[in-house]
Regions:
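Transmembrane helix-bundle signature of multi-pass membrane transporters/permeases
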Residues: 8-12, 34, 79, 95-103, ...
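Long, highly hydrophobic alpha-helical transmembrane signal-anchor segments
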Residues: 56-100
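Hydrophobic transmembrane alpha-helices
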Residues: 1-72
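Helix-loop-helix junctions within the multi-pass membrane cores of secondary transporters/permeases
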Residues: 93-139
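Generic secondary-structure signature for well-ordered alpha-helical cores
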Residues: 11-18, 44, 81, 85, ...
Length: 139
């Protein structure tokens, strides 16, 4: 249970770059060793993280293209492979579909969040700064 919580925090750490710019903390090369440390196999975490990084290396959001989520795919692919004792190639085979599914859920959430701007507009009309801040924090 503790490992699952720590892996969730590792994923949150990977997504913190959305709020502070783009230091590329969400890359499998960064998160793989952290996942390996959490699960007790840093060496395998480095190997799997590097393998996944090669796949996700060119995955950048340009225009309307949203690439597979390297953070979720990297963390979960590395974790599943380490726990199951699988190779880096098998981790890649798991990480790609996980990353694509995560991106699909992300698109759904962003669509829902676009509707909350109307609520923020209402709060702005009322002069409710705390309401606006709450909506912006939620998004």
């Amino acid at each position: 249970m503790l490992q699952a919580l720590l892996l969730g925090l590792c994923g949150a750490y990977g997504h913190i770059d959305w709020g502070i710019g783009t230091p590329f903390l969400n890359r499998p090369l960064v998160l793989g060793p952290i996942v390996g440390l959490i699960l007790g196999n840093v060496e395998q975490g480095i190997i799997i993280g590097a393998t996944l990084e090669v796949f996700f290396l060119g995955a950048m959001a340009i225009g309307s293209y949203i690439p597979p989520d390297a953070c979720v795919g990297g963390v979960l692919g590395t974790a599943f492979a380490i726990k199951a004792g699988l190779s880096a190639e098998m981790a890649l085979a798991m990480a790609i579909p996980i990353a694509i599914i995560a991106t699909s859920f992300q698109n759904i959430l962003w669509s829902i969040f676009s509707m909350t701007s109307k609520i923020a507009d209402r709060y702005a009309d009322q002069g409710n700064e705390k309401g606006i801040a709450a909506i912006m924090f939620m998004e």
